[in-house]
C-alpha cells in the first residue's frame, strides 16, 4: 500500500524500517511529510545568518534513509561542541583534508564539497565580528542542504539531490510540508491567553544567557585615557546595531526569535508550559497570524495514499504544523477510502503534559477542522456543515498499554475510531507496529 507519514524528525526515525516494509518492500510508494519550522539547535544559526526554511528534521530523515554508508557518516556528522575545535574542523571539511572524506569516492566528494563550499562563501559574505556564526555542534548535512538550496533556488530540488547522491530508493519521498525558500515560524496560543513564539521556545527553550550591557548604557564617549578593551567593546556595540539589518531575520522580527536556540536539551522537561496549548499557528515577522498553503507535492501524495500515518513525536510542534495547513487538511478529510492512523506517544512531554487520550485526539481534530474552515473561507467556498465526523480525520489509533497517555477505547468506538493496543513493549517498536499497520491495511 502507498503510505504517507506525517511527522517530525527524531522520534519517527526509529520507525522507518516499519514504514519501508509495509510499502517499499511491496513495490509501493512511501512519502514522509516533514515540518520546516524547527528553529532549535544548529539550525537556529543558519536561520539567523542565512535564513530560509528550517531543514533539521528533513536532514535527519534523509540521513536515516540513505543507502550509502559513507554519506550517512558525512551528512550525519556534527562538529565538536568546542568553539575553536568546531571552526577548525569545519575548515578542514571545506578544504577537503578532513578524514571524513577518506572513504568517499573522489567524484562524490567533489560533488558534495562544491555545495559545502557554496555555503561557506555565503557565511563569509555575511560575517560580522560582533556576532559571528557559531559552528558548535553544527550538522554537515544541514550545511549541504542549505548550500544546495541556495545554489539551486529550490528546497525540493536540494532534497532530491541529497537523496539521489545517497542512493535512496526511488519509491521513497521526503517532502517539506511547505515548499518555500523563506523562514516560517510557529506560535502557541495558550488557554490563559499567553503566546509563545518559536518551535524551540515552545518545546525545549534554550537557557538564556544574559548579555552584559553595562558599557552600552554609558555615554558613547572614548576618553583618551580609557582602556583599549572598553574602547573595543563600545565599537563592537555600535557595529552590531548598525549591522543588524543585514542578517537574515529582519530587524522588526519578534525579539524572542532573535535569541539563539543553539544550546538546548531535548531531554530537559523540568518546566511545563504555564497553561495548556489552545492552538498552534504560523506567524509572519510582525507576529501576525498567516495561513500558508501545503506543498502541492504533498497534496498529490496524500491523494494517492492508501494509509496516512500521524506518527509519534511532538504533537504541537512536529505534527500540527503539518496538519494545520488548510489545503492539506482538506485533502486528508476528502480521502474517504484512506486509513488515517494516529500513533500515540508513550510518554508526556512539555507540550502535552496532563492531556489524556481524548483531549490529545480532540486537539488534532479541532486544529484540522479550523484549518479547513479557514481554507474554504479564503477560497470563497460556502460550507453549510463544517461539523465533521471524527473518523473523517482519524480512523485508527495505535497506543501502548503501558504508555503514560491513557486511552479509553469506549469513547473512540462511539466515534467509529478503532483502537489497537500494543502490550509487548514500553515504547513504540518497529516490528510490533508493522504487524498492527498491516492488519489495519487489510481491513475494509
UniProtKB/Swiss-Prot annotation:
A single GO molecular function term of this UniProt record: LPPG:FO 2-phospho-L-lactate transferase activity
Domain of life: Eukaryota
Alphabetical list of Gene3D superfamilies matching this protein: CofD-like domains
Family matches, as Pfam families: CofD (PF01933)
Any further remark recorded for this protein: Present with 1100 molecules/cell in log phase SD medium.
Name of the featured protein: Uncharacterized protein YNL011C
Species name: Saccharomyces cerevisiae (strain ATCC 204508 / S288c)
Amino acid at each position: 500500500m502507498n503510505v504517507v507519514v506525517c511527522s517530525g524528525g527524531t522520534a519517527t526515525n526509529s520507525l522507518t524500517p516499519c514504514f519501508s516494509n509495509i510499502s517499499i518492500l511491496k513495490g509501493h510508494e512511501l512519502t514522509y511529510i516533514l515540518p520546516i519550522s524547527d528553529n532549535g539547535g544548529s539550525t537556529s544559526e543558519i536561520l539567523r545568518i542565512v535564513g530560509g526554511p528550517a531543514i533539521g528534521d528533513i536532514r535527519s530523515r534523509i540521513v536515516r534513509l540513505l543507502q550509502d554508508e559513507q554519506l550517512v557518516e558525512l551528512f550525519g556528522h556534527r562538529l565538536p561542541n568546542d568553539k575553536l575545535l568546531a571552526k577548525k574542523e569545519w575548515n578542514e571539511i571545506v578544504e577537503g583534508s578532513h578524514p571524513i572524506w577518506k572513504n568517499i569516492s573522489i567524484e562524490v566528494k567533489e560533488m558534495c564539497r562544491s555545495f559545502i563550499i557554496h555555503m561557506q562563501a555565503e557565511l563569509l559574505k555575511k560575517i560580522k565580528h560582533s556576532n559571528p556564526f557559531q559552528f558548535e555542534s553544527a550538522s554537515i548535512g544541514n550545511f549541504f542542504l542549505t548550500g544546495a538550496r541556495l545554489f539551486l533556488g529550490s528546497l525540493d530540488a536540494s532534497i532530491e539531490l541529497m537523496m539521489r547522491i545517497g542512493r535512496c530508493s526511488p519509491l521513497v519521498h521526503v517532502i517539506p510540508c511547505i515548499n518555500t525558500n523563506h523562514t516560517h515560524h510557529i506560535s502557541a496560543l495558550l488557554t490563559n491567553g499567553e503566546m509563545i513564539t518559536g518551535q524551540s521556545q515552545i518545546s525545549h527553550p534554550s537557557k538564556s544567557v544574559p548579555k552584559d550591557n553595562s558599557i552600552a548604557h554609558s555615554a558613547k564617549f572614548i576618553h583618551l585615557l580609557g582602556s583599549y578593551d572598553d574602547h573595543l567593546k563600545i565599537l563592537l556595540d555600535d557595529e552590531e546595531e548598525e549591522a543588524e539589518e543585514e542578517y537574515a531575520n529582519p530587524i522588526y522580527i519578534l525579539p524572542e526569535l532573535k535569541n539563539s536556540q543553539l544550546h538546548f536539551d531535548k531531554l530537559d522537561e523540568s518546566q511545563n508550559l504555564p497553561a495548556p496549548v489552545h492552538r498552534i499557528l504560523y506567524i509572519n515577522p510582525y507576529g501576525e497570524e498567516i495561513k500558508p498553503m501545503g506543498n502541492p507535492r504533498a497534496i498529490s501524495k496524500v491523494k494517492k495514499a492508501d494509509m496516512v500515518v500521524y506518527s509519534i513525536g511532538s504533537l504541537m510542534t512536529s505534527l500540527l504544523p503539518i496538519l494545520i495547513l488548510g489545503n492539506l487538511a482538506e485533502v486528508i478529510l476528502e480521502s474517504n477510502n484512506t486509513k488515517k492512523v494516529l500513533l500515540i506517544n508513550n510518554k508526556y512531554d512539555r507540550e502535552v503534559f496532563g492531556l489524556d487520550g481524548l483531549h490529545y485526539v480532540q486537539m488534532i481534530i479541532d486544529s484540522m477542522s479550523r484549518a479547513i474552515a479557514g481554507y474554504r473561507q479564503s477560497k470563497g467556498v460556502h460550507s453549510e456543515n463544517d461539523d465533521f465526523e471524527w473518523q473523517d480525520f482519524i480512523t485508527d489509533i495505535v497506543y501502548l498499554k503501558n504508555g503514560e497517555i491513557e486511552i479509553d477505547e469506549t469513547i473512540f468506538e462511539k466515534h467509529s475510531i478503532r483502537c489497537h493496543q500494543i502490550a509487548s513493549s514500553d515504547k513504540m517498536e518497529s516490528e510490533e507496529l508493522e504487524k498492527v499497520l498491516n492488519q489495519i491495511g487489510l481491513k475494509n
